[in-house]
Amino acid sequence: MVAFGKKLKERSIQEWQGYYINYKLMKKKVKQYSRQLEGGNLERRHVLKDFSRMLDNQIEKIALFMLEQQGLLASRLQTLRGSHDALQEQPDISHMSYLKEEYRAVGQDLLKLLFFVEMNAIGIRKILKKFDKRFGYRFTNYYVKTRANHPYSELQQVFRHVGLGAVVGAVSRNLHELQNNQGSYLSIYDQPVLPLQDPVVDSIRAAVDRLTRSTNFLHFMAQHALIMQEELPSPQDEEGEEEDGRYHFMSLLLNLVNTFLYMVNTYIIVPTADDYSMSLGAAATVCGVVIGAMAVAQLFSSVYFSAWSNRSYFKPLIFSSIVLFIGNLLYALAFDFNSIAVLLIGRLFCGLGSARAVNRRYISDCVPLKIRMQASAGFVSASALGMACGPALAGLLQIRFKIYKLTFNQDTLPGWVMAVAWLIYLVWLAISFREPAREPEEIPKTSEESNHSAVQDVNLEKGMKQPLLLTSEEIEEQGEDECDGSEEASEDSRTPANSILAAYRLLTPSVKVQLLIYFMLKYAMEILLSESSVITTYYFGWSTSSVAIFLFCLGLTVLPVNLVVGSYISNMFEDRQILLVSEIMVCVGILLSFHVVVPYTVPQYVCSGLIMFVSAEVLEGVNLSLLSRVMSSRLSRGTYNGGLLSTEAGTIARVIADATITVAGFFGRNMLLNVTLLPSLVICVLSIVATCFTYNSLY
């Protein structure tokens, strides 16, 4: 892993070198502070004051240069505006082409400025993170709170690129006008065939979205998948050709279908799980164990599927389909065997076939960057659609008949239908999936060996390129670079974590809080969904069809809610603000769900459940967005990646929630609702408190 300081130097725009954050100087000062504090020669108060002043100066330098460049771009646009107006009066094809090229040139310079701002924003985040890590302070919280919220904030100039929006709008609008030839031609027959989009405008929009982390609907949906991108921007997509060679549309489609079918498989039994349990001689609340058995097995399957995807995508998907076919077959046959054990084994098999880790990994590794966001949004949409279709399908399977000794009814038909679905999918997979080409495998090294080797390689390469005799200044600079590289290799190495323990060590307080929030929302949602059939039957006498319709309606809210949040709300408020409000709304939904004194009514249950579910859906998107932002880049690849950690946190929450339902059954059905909601309330309050403590580090 090349140190960030080196990457900053390599990727920076040469003529603007003096205006970038002096990352090397800031790192040197952090080391100096550390030595002085250890020697007792410096007070902590002086360190904070001096470092704040240095960082303020660096940000001021960046912000003022941004304003200067914006002024130059605005001046050029103003000049072009006059030529554009003249063109409207006297149309001229050659002059129009000239204007388009001039606007594109401004667009290219605007791209350079956006790239400049993004590199500096990353540098500021990294130096703040390094300072906190070195001294154990919560300096980032203090600095962001005092600077970002100030009315004359220069920090906001960098992180919110204040003023650049007008330049982006002017370039885009004028190019669009010229491209659509408004007033430029006397006759429609003279109009050539022009592309609908200009590449420069597309590049500018992509750069702005990346810089602001703007969450339009597509981006907001994609964040649910927690498929992390490279942190450092690059003017060109260096991996584009390689990714295009590995990408295969039908293989991507098969991964998305796998995601959809698995979510259908998860939720298709929810409306009838209590009835199935009672028909086999168990209590209705054993439905918690039946539903949760799949999640228990998924705890283990997520790990081995994630590891397996390092070597192949096709074989894990084949194995997943076979295991899910067997699991659903056992689930369906449990009725005729009159065995709760066979039922549970069937659900365990279904959990062992969870290939969501493979689906995520395929999108992350094989889908080209230009369509990865669409693929990630497709992954989330497939999950949401499966979640809605599962209960709806169960509501349609209200028939009963026998073929020989096999019983087909509302309890067993979900198993039979899913077994047939997985069998068809298996055949399609075997025919259409194409295994992507892989790079030659390297002998794995320990992180210590990798870091040492990386530093040695850098030193050797530099030794071959540099002259034999160096000046004392050059020697000192080289020594600092080597030290920086060594530190970056040990602290910010991009080598993937090679164990759960190694991954856990990479979790900062902010990441731990986000994982706690993810645990909380999955726990609350699982309680709501899994006990819905028992609660509604006890209080309201609902039939299986009524429960299925209720769950189907909940599932249908996912996409519209994300559309509203992703397209509007997230563009008006910061992610951390939406996060905190969503947590509070989940807490409100939980409180409204309690059965206290008044008779429990359908409106109370439906409204409180809707508030809880919708708020949790909004919370999930924002939570995973922030999680991908604050998580170490070492967790973006490998077996023990961020996606696996979030999946495990959510799965553990589901397991505990389903176990809670079964245990609460011993208190009687009249106590089930309140007993299961109490842990949800406690965890939700804890997550709100934890969010408040880490609020200023979520940026």
UniProtKB/Swiss-Prot annotation:
Gene3D superfamilies: MFS general substrate transporter like domains. It is found in: Membrane. One of its GO terms (molecular function) is transmembrane transporter activity. The chain crosses the membrane at residues 249-269, 280-300, 317-337, 339-358, 377-397, 413-433, 515-535, 546-566, 578-598, 606-626, 671-691. Residues 2-145 form the SPX domain. Residues 475-490 have a biased composition (Acidic residues). It holds the Pfam family MFS_1. Residues 475-494 are annotated as: Disordered. It is a multi-pass membrane protein. InterPro entries: MFS, MFS_Domain-Containing_Protein, MFS_trans_sf, SPX_dom, SPXM_SPX_plant. GO terms for cellular component: membrane. Keywords: Membrane, Transmembrane, Transmembrane helix. It comes from the Eukaryota. PANTHER family: INNER MEMBRANE TRANSPORT PROTEIN YAJR, SPX DOMAIN-CONTAINING PROTEIN. Belongs to the major facilitator superfamily. This is SPX domain-containing membrane protein At4g22990. It comes from Arabidopsis thaliana (Mouse-ear cress).
